[in-house]
């Protein structure tokens, strides 16, 4: 690069300009006396005293080269001649002689100061406001400048610019917390952003994962975020010294966040966060005063990888909110990993395919696709009815049946019978009417007896087979129906859950309670199809029907 020491030879005699006063070269030399190195000033003084300002031969090429090399790093911003200076002082014709290196000096100096990162340039372009400019034309011009600073069309190809736009749109459609997390890693392409997200999913899905990178790498990552335009600062020296004390570190559970008004602030020392495994002798005494609520929460969480986030390192509240949501989400996944570890530990090759029935009943051999259906099916063998109606005490083996039954207590009963009884469902009315008409579509093949319901036929068929699957644990007595076992067990416990609200009388079976309750209501649901007479119990109806059949007298 050509310096001022060689300017006299290149420029030649200055054009006559009487009004300009002192020589511009002299002015520049005087201004540079205090700024530039003393070696260069001595060389200028030597030339003026010798009177040989038109030649540089007395110094020799080696001396000139030495001065140029010596002053290259010290005086470069002050000695380079700009294009504006040549035009002002009449040396425009010598620009071609100086070459492109001197002319481009100012541009090189601007580059040395450092260009903003692509993310900062993008944010400047996107966040530029109309109120920042005096008018629309200035706003448009400024937008063009900011767009060029971001996309850099002078160095990027069309494909690279397209990739930048695709990357920006891809980050826009991501959830807020994932968007901020990916931006912190400064991906250069959409493919790199996808790779980062896939790696994050694997980390969250792998139980018991440990951090293997040393703390100094963590520090470098934070410093990289700071220089790349994120609103974060590098780790403080105090935090770095604490972290560097141990070669490896682990994290248990999520980061705990302290709420201060509306703002959420992370605990300042990462080693003080709940569950961080460190040397007990170096723990701060404040750790002993952690609330029992935090400790109980941390004990129930599975070990997981959580990035160390310094306190107050977020530049906006939205980023702090992102951190809160991200840690909360990770903590939720970690808490579920323990319950799902049995399934998660199972190899993918042994997992059931869709529609495959791997759950088999040990009693009858029936297969099911999931364990919940098998559990429901087993209740048909055990007779278990864990779902009890709080209104009438009726028990059911499935929650769905209880839900349907409970509606009869809450909603209207639009389906009425001639006997005055009402039902919430038409199917219940049909079953009830079979009692009046004595319709019995379900017939036993062994004895020919017919029943109005399929369940009644199944219970009756056990008389022929002698099956009594329901056994009392107290006395060992067996029953063919679960209702019989339930009634029998109340003899041991003395329980009488069915109590009449009218007179206070209690019963150990719902059928006895229903018969008694009809005394107060006057309900007579059983009526004779021959004469239309009604009765409050089925036994009374049977006795009456003997008159019509000739088997007995009317009671």
Swiss-Prot record:
PANTHER family: ZINC FINGER AND SCAN DOMAIN-CONTAINING, ZINC FINGER AND SCAN DOMAIN-CONTAINING PROTEIN 16. Belongs to the krueppel C2H2-type zinc-finger protein family. Residues 210-240 have a biased composition (Polar residues). Signal peptide: none annotated. Expressed predominantly in the spermatocytes and spermatids of adult testes. It is also present at lower levels in the ovary, brain, spleen, embryo and fetus. One of its GO terms (cellular component) is nucleus. It is found in: Nucleus. The gene is Zscan21. A zinc finger (C2H2-type) spans 359-381, 387-409, 415-436, 442-464, 470-492, 498-520, 526-548. There is a cross-link at residues 26, 302, 313, 431 (Glycyl lysine isopeptide (Lys-Gly) (interchain with G-Cter in SUMO2)). One of its GO terms (biological process) is oogenesis. GO terms for molecular function: DNA binding; DNA-binding transcription activator activity, RNA polymerase II-specific; RNA polymerase II cis-regulatory region sequence-specific DNA binding; zinc ion binding. The keyword Protein biosynthesis does not apply. It comes from Mus musculus. Pfam families: SCAN, zf-C2H2. Residues 1-74, 102-133, 204-243, 263-354 are annotated as: Disordered. Keywords: Activator, Developmental protein, Differentiation, DNA-binding, Isopeptide bond, Meiosis, Metal-binding, Nucleus, Oogenesis, Repeat, Spermatogenesis, Transcription, Transcription regulation, Ubl conjugation, Zinc, Zinc-finger. The keyword Cytoplasm does not apply. Strong transcriptional activator. Plays an important role in spermatogenesis; essential for the progression of meiotic prophase I in spermatocytes. Disulfide bonds: none annotated. Its main location: nucleus. This is Zinc finger and SCAN domain-containing protein 21.
């Amino acid at each position: 690069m050509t310096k001022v020491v060689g300017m006299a030879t290149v420029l030649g005699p200055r054009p006559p300009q009487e009004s300009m006063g002192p020589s511009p070269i002299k002015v520049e030399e005087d201004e540079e006396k205090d700024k530039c190195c003393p070696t260069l000033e001595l060389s200028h003084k030597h030339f003026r005293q010798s009177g040989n300002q038109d030649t540089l031969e007395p110094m020799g090429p080696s001396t000139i080269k030495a001065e140029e090399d010596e002053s290259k790093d010290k005086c470069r911003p002050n000695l380079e001649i700009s294009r504006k200076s040549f035009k002002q002082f009449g040396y425009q014709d010598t620009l071609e002689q100086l070459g492109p290196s001197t002319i481009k000096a100012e541009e090189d100096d601007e580059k040395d100061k450092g260009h903003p990162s692509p993310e900062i340039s993008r944010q400047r372009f996107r966040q530029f406001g109309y109120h920042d400019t005096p008018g629309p034309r200035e706003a448009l011009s400024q937008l063009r400048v900011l767009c060029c600073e971001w996309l850099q069309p002078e160095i990027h190809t069309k494909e690279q610019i397209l990739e930048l736009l695709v990357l920006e749109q891809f980050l826009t459609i991501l959830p807020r917390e994932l968007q901020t997390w990916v931006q912190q890693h400064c991906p250069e392409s959409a493919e790199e952003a996808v790779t980062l997200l896939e790696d994050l999913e694997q980390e969250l899905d792998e139980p018991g994962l440990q951090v293997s990178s040393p703390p100094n790498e963590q520090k470098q990552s934070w410093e990289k975020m700071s220089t790349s335009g994120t609103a974060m600062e590098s780790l403080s020296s105090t935090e770095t010294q604490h972290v560097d004390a141990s070669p490896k570190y682990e994290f248990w559970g999520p980061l705990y966040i302290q709420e201060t008004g509306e703002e959420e602030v992370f605990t300042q020392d990462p080693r003080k966060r709940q569950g961080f495994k460190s040397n007990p002798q170096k723990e701060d005494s404040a750790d002993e005063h952690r609330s029992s609520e935090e400790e109980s929460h941390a004990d129930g969480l599975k070990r997981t990888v959580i990035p160390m986030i310094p306190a107050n390192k977020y530049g906006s509240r939205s980023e702090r909110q992102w951190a809160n949501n991200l840690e909360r989400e990770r903590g939720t996944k970690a808490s579920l990993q323990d319950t799902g570890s049995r399934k998660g530990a199972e190899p993918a090759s042994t997992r059931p395919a869709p529609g495959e029935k791997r759950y088999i009943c040990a009693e009858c051999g029936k297969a099911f696709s999931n364990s919940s259906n098998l559990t429901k099916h087993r209740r048909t063998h055990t007779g278990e009815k864990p779902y009890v109606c709080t209104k009438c005490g009726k028990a059911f083996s499935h929650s769905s049946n209880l839900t349907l039954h409970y509606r009869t207590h809450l909603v209207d009963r639009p389906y009425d019978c001639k006997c005055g009884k009402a039902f919430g469902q038409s199917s219940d009315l049909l079953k009830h009417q079979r009692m009046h008409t004595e319709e019995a579509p379900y017939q036993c093949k062994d004895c020919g007896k017919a029943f109005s319901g399929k369940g009644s036929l199944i219970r009756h068929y056990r008389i022929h087979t002698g099956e009594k699957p329901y056994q009392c644990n107290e006395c060992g007595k067996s029953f063919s129906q679960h209702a019989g076992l339930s009634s029998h067990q109340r003899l041991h416990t003395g329980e009488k859950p069915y109590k009449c609200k009218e007179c206070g009388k209690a019963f150990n079976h719902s059928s006895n309670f229903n018969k008694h309750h009809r005394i107060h209501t006057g309900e007579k649901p059983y009526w004779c199809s021959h004469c239309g007479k009604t009765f409050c119990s089925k036994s009374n109806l049977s006795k009456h029907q003997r008159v019509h059949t000739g088997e007995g007298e009317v009671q």
